[in-house]
Amino acid sequence: MVGWLKGLIVYKLQRGNRSQITLNCNGVGYEVQITQREWLTLENDQTIQLWIHQSISADNWQFFGFKSTQERDIFRELISVNGVGPQAGMALMQECKSQELVEAISNGDLRRLCKAQGIGKRTAERLAVELRASIAAFAGMDPAPSLAEGVSSEQMPESGADVEATLSMLGYDDLEVRRAIRAIAEGSDGPPPPGDDQDAWLRGCLQWLSRDSA
């Protein structure tokens, strides 16, 4: 496996959403895909070194290059999630710098994640759920609290389980439900309803969810 390359840039290419360079490493040319942000800073005849993720399939070998081991490791975390292939991973790396991406995943910022090409809401939710702890840990951050943590018992509706069950029956998944309850508890639409007003909590959550999906 190739883990690191140092060489002279002999060719730069952009094809669609892919940004690629060809590195001359001791007489061997390696085609390496990088983010467009990095591609724009490079020139032909420039010597660079990159940490490499090597993707091997039955009919194709691909190299993805990164300036640091941290960037490469974040990329590897991303593509470990079902439905996130190398191109989607690169789109996420292009949309956000490393720290921004870690924070978006750790904080469940689905809107930011969905700005990356090819990342829909369901995929963003999987990223937030599956990587929240691991991506924060290896990037040197404390994991953010889960999306429902930090809501006091006084803020939660007394029939919170019923609210969650009703929203689940309406087709909302666990992450969406927890985000909605936390948003209402934190007063995103004004003071939270009384704890015993199940209908008001349900209406508030539904209104928040409808805006969030817009």
Curated annotation (Swiss-Prot):
<keyword id="KW-0238">DNA-binding</keyword>
<keyword id="KW-0227">DNA damage</keyword>
<dbReference type="InterPro" id="IPR011114">
    <property type="entry name" value="RuvA_C"/>
</dbReference>
<comment type="subunit">
    <text>Homotetramer. Forms an RuvA(8)-RuvB(12)-Holliday junction (HJ) complex. HJ DNA is sandwiched between 2 RuvA tetramers; dsDNA enters through RuvA and exits via RuvB. An RuvB hexamer assembles on each DNA strand where it exits the tetramer. Each RuvB hexamer is contacted by two RuvA subunits (via domain III) on 2 adjacent RuvB subunits; this complex drives branch migration. In the full resolvosome a probable DNA-RuvA(4)-RuvB(12)-RuvC(2) complex forms which resolves the HJ.</text>
</comment>
<comment type="function">
    <text>The RuvA-RuvB-RuvC complex processes Holliday junction (HJ) DNA during genetic recombination and DNA repair, while the RuvA-RuvB complex plays an important role in the rescue of blocked DNA replication forks via replication fork reversal (RFR). RuvA specifically binds to HJ cruciform DNA, conferring on it an open structure. The RuvB hexamer acts as an ATP-dependent pump, pulling dsDNA into and through the RuvAB complex. HJ branch migration allows RuvC to scan DNA until it finds its consensus sequence, where it cleaves and resolves the cruciform DNA.</text>
</comment>
<dbReference type="Pfam" id="PF14520">
    <property type="entry name" value="HHH_5"/>
</dbReference>
<dbReference type="InterPro" id="IPR010994">
    <property type="entry name" value="RuvA_2-like"/>
</dbReference>
<feature type="region of interest" description="Domain II">
    <location>
        <begin position="68"/>
        <end position="146"/>
    </location>
</feature>
<dbReference type="Pfam" id="PF01330">
    <property type="entry name" value="RuvA_N"/>
</dbReference>
<dbReference type="GO" id="GO:0005524">
    <property type="term" value="F:ATP binding"/>
</dbReference>
<dbReference type="GO" id="GO:0009378">
    <property type="term" value="F:four-way junction helicase activity"/>
</dbReference>
<dbReference type="GO" id="GO:0006281">
    <property type="term" value="P:DNA repair"/>
</dbReference>
<feature type="region of interest" description="Domain III">
    <location>
        <begin position="155"/>
        <end position="214"/>
    </location>
</feature>
<keyword id="KW-0233">DNA recombination</keyword>
<feature type="region of interest" description="Domain I">
    <location>
        <begin position="1"/>
        <end position="67"/>
    </location>
</feature>
<dbReference type="GO" id="GO:0009379">
    <property type="term" value="C:Holliday junction helicase complex"/>
</dbReference>
<dbReference type="Pfam" id="PF07499">
    <property type="entry name" value="RuvA_C"/>
</dbReference>
<dbReference type="GO" id="GO:0048476">
    <property type="term" value="C:Holliday junction resolvase complex"/>
</dbReference>
<dbReference type="GO" id="GO:0006310">
    <property type="term" value="P:DNA recombination"/>
</dbReference>
<dbReference type="InterPro" id="IPR000085">
    <property type="entry name" value="RuvA"/>
</dbReference>
<dbReference type="GO" id="GO:0000400">
    <property type="term" value="F:four-way junction DNA binding"/>
</dbReference>
<dbReference type="GO" id="GO:0005737">
    <property type="term" value="C:cytoplasm"/>
</dbReference>
<keyword id="KW-0963">Cytoplasm</keyword>
<feature type="region of interest" description="Flexible linker">
    <location>
        <begin position="147"/>
        <end position="154"/>
    </location>
</feature>
<keyword id="KW-0234">DNA repair</keyword>
<protein>
    <recommendedName>
        <fullName>Holliday junction branch migration complex subunit RuvA</fullName>
    </recommendedName>
</protein>
<dbReference type="InterPro" id="IPR012340">
    <property type="entry name" value="NA-bd_OB-fold"/>
</dbReference>
<dbReference type="InterPro" id="IPR013849">
    <property type="entry name" value="DNA_helicase_Holl-junc_RuvA_I"/>
</dbReference>
<comment type="similarity">
    <text>Belongs to the RuvA family.</text>
</comment>
